[in-house]
Amino acid sequence: SPTKFVKKHHLANQTLSELLNAFLEEKGLARADVIRAAALNETFGYQIFMGQRNPSRNKVLQIAFAMRLNLRETNRILRAAGASDLYCKNRRDAIIIFCLDKGYRLQKTNEELYRFDEETIC
């Protein structure tokens, strides 16, 4: 049935907090470690994971890098946060996509953005 298909493939409209917590579980990550790796204020980070705060696009990207998400997963959490997907024809986004694909960490990604005179993520 369509309902089973949607559930099996996680296509239901999940909130950002639901998605983030599902990724934590799926990837065996600890929330505190992700918040630290994302260079987020601890309280603010916990509020994002609890669904009490709506983060900016850059904050969501910080979390994506901290969780080592791929492009598809990153775009899912961006959409859930009400932000635009990473778009390859946008120069800054293209650099971020490249860094995600290469498995770069947040700091290395910021260095690449800086090197190309683009706004860093944080």
Where are these regions (language model features)?
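Long, compositionally biased
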Residues: 65-67, 92-120
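Short alpha-helical "recognition helix" segments of helix-turn-helix
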Residues: 30-37
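Key DNA-contact positions within bacterial/archaeal DNA-binding proteins
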Residues: 32, 43, 72
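A short, Lys/Arg-rich alpha-helix, primarily the initiator
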Residues: 1-30, 109-122
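Recognition helix of helix-turn-helix/homeodomain-like DNA-binding domains
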Residues: 39-55, 80-82
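The alpha-helix within a helix-turn-helix
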Residues: 24, 35, 64
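Short, basic-rich loop-to-helix N-cap that marks the start of a DNA-contacting helix
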Residues: 52-65
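Short, charged recognition helix plus adjacent turn
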Residues: 75-103
